[in-house]
């Protein structure tokens, strides 16, 4: 993700990225996120004053799980866009995390949705949710993984541990 979509969205919704970030910070307060939570940009790219805790990420995912449109996006493994004048074949988007986690032992947990991210300061990060074999909803947030595959293994290990 090159963040072009969120930049276009921020301009459409608020007129500018800065105004959109103001809405993001307002919403963070309304959601009861930590006092440390502060957005400096809409993309999530590193900025020295851009802060979020692991708990904040979990709270955002928990709220996203309740939103039908967000659920649909976060649960989609593959999406094929229709052709456009710039991409005659359309574009294909793939959530590699959702595909890769299926190759791991997650203790019988069915991982349903995930959002991955990377910035050099926090390495590979994932927030995901799934349903344990006992029917319990689980939400896992990890950061600091050294590679995309390590992030998958870290998540699978935690799902396995907490699904029992």
Predicted regions located by residue number:
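Active-site-proximal cofactor/substrate-binding loop regions of enzyme domains
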Residues: 4
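Short helix- or helix-capping micro-motifs
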Residues: 1
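A short acidic, helix-capping loop that chelates divalent metal ions and anchors anionic groups
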Residues: 7
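Penicillin-recognizing serine hydrolase domain
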Residues: 11-164
